[in-house]
A protein has these predicted regions:
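Conserved N-terminal alpha-helix of the aminotransferase class I/II PLP-enzyme fold
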Residues: 5-57
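Conserved PLP-enzyme active-site core in the AAT-like
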Residues: 27, 38-42, 55-192
C-alpha cells in the first residue's frame, strides 16, 4: 500500500544508486545480480544474496523470516550472540543443546544424544513456558563450525531431526570453505 501510494520513483530515489551500471545490492540488479547468481552456482545453492553486514545480520534475517513470538526453537548453547539476540527480539522459547567441556573448561562438541528426539522432547516437557507439549519446534540453529573448529555431520543431524523440526539453520560463518574440499563432505549445509 505504501509503495502504491508513493510509487516506484520516489522509493528508488530514497536509496543510493550512485553508479547504476554497477548494479544495486538492495534490488539485486546488474553485475551484483550476476555475481550473486555465480556465487549460488559455485556454492550449489538455489539462491544466494550478499549481506554486507556479516553473518550476524544473516542470522537475524533467517530468524526474522522464520520465527514468530512464542515459537519453540532448538539452539546450540554455544551459539553466536546474534542468535541469542534473535531469540530475545522474536520472543521465542529456547531449548538448548548442551556442549561438553573439558577439564580446562574449553567448550567441546554437542554429544550426539543431545540431538536425539527423545532427549529434546524431555526438555520440551520440562520447560514451564511451553504450554503445548506436542509442539513442533520452528527452527534448530547449530553453530557449524565452532570457533575451535568443531564440525558436525550435517546429513546425520538432518536425518535425526527429519520431520521433527520445521527448519534447520546451520550458522556456517566459520566454514565457507567446506564446499571446496572433499574432507568436509556431509559436514556443511550449503548445497546439501
Amino acid at each position: 500500500m505504501f509503495h502504491q501510494f508513493f510509487g516506484e520513483n520516489m522509493l528508488r530515489a530514497d536509496v543510493c544508486n550512485a553508479v547504476e551500471e554497477l548494479g544495486q545490492l538492495l534490488d539485486h540488479t546488474g553485475p551484483v545480480l550476476q555475481s550473486e547468481r555465480n556465487a549460488a552456482r559455485i556454492f550449489n545453492a538455489d539462491h544466494l544474496f550478499f549481506v554486507t553486514n556479516g553473518t550476524s545480520t544473516s542470522n537475524k534475517i533467517v530468524w526474522h523470516s522464520t520465527v514468530a513470538p512464542g515459537d519453540v526453537v532448538i539452539v546450540d548453547r554455544n551459539c553466536h550472540k546474534s542468535v541469542i539476540h534473535s531469540i530475545t527480539m522474536m520472543g521465542a522459547i529456547p531449548i538448548f543443546l548442551m556442549p561438553t567441556r573439558n577439564h580446562l573448561g574449553i567448550i567441546g562438541p554437542i554429544p550426539k544424544e543431545e540431538f536425539e528426539w527423545k532427549n529434546i522432547k524431555k526438555k520440551i516437557d520440562a520447560n514451564p513456558f511451553i504450554k503445548d507439549k506436542n509442539v513442533v519446534p520452528r527452527v534448530m540453529t547449530l553453530t557449524q563450525s565452532t570457533y575451535d573448529g568443531i564440525v558436525y555431520n550435517v546429513e546425520m543431524i538432518k536425518e535425526m531431526l527429519d520431520g521433527k523440526v520445521d527448519s534447520l539453520h546451520f550458522d556456517e560463518a566459520w566454514l565457507p570453505h567446506a564446499a571446496f574440499h572433499p574432507f568436509y563432505k556431509d559436514m556443511h549445509a550449503i548445497g546439501a
